[in-house]
Curated annotation (Swiss-Prot):
This is Small t antigen. Promotes efficient viral genome replication by accelerating both G1 and S phase progression of the cell cycle. Inhibits host PP2A by binding to the A subunit, thereby displacing lower affinity regulatory B subunit. Inactivation of PP2A in turn results in the transactivation of cyclin A and cyclin D1 promoters. Late during the infection cycle, ST may induce dephosphorylation of host MTOR, leading to the inhibition of cap-dependent translation. May establish and maintain high levels of viral genomes during persistent infection in cell culture. It comes from BK polyomavirus (strain AS). SMART domains: DnaJ. One of its GO terms (cellular component) is host cell cytoplasm. Interacts with host PPP2R1A; the interaction inhibits PP2A activity.
């Protein structure tokens, strides 16, 4: 996500969206703010045309580069495939046993917390650059990106974002 826009562009986009810079990378929140600001800046509604154009340019560039970063698209999926990989209970889908899963991921645990952390460890050895949030959706990248401690509250914020993220983007 840090390679999508340069620093000045990302700061400008966050200012135009009216969001704190710490929210950079929270794509569902950014999308919601973008739609709200489109109504506010729209020239037909008496808004600032220049701000609207600049916001559109930056947002579309960010959106396109995020899509490219998440290529290749592996096609469609159906719910029976997902259910086979993960437990049906939504409480254990993201984290089966707190704090056990938060301390050490288990290859035998089907929760997303463990699976994404194990995926992070595997991918880390295949890349020269370090993995960062949006490149990797594990809770470690999340806490590092947003500067948070690993707590149950942080887990809840992570679960909320993961829950709104398309499954194929998780790269599981």
């Amino acid at each position: 996500m840090d390679k999508v826009l340069n620093r000045e562009e990302s700061m400008e986009l966050m200012d135009l969206l009216g969001l704190e810079r710490a929210a950079w990378g929270n794509l569902p929140l950014m999308r919601k703010a973008y739609l709200k600001k489109c109504k506010e800046f729209h020239p037909d509604k008496g808004g600032d045309e220049d701000k609207m154009k600049r916001m559109n340019t930056l947002y579309k560039k960010m959106e396109q580069d995020v899509k490219v970063a998440h290529q290749p698209d592996f096609g469609t999926w159906n719910s029976s495939e997902v259910c086979a990989d993960f437990p049906l209970c939504p409480d254990t889908l993201y984290c089966k046993e707190w704090p056990i899963c938060s301390k050490k991921p288990s290859v035998h645990c089907p929760c997303m917390l463990c699976q994404l952390r194990l995926r992070h460890l595997n991918r880390k050895f295949l890349r020269k650059e370090p993995l960062v949030w949006i490149d990797c959706y594990c809770i470690d990248c999340f806490t590092q990106w947003f500067g948070l401690d690993l707590t149950e509250e942080t887990l809840q914020w992570w679960v909320q974002i993961i829950g709104e993220t398309p499954f194929r983007d998780l790269k599981l």
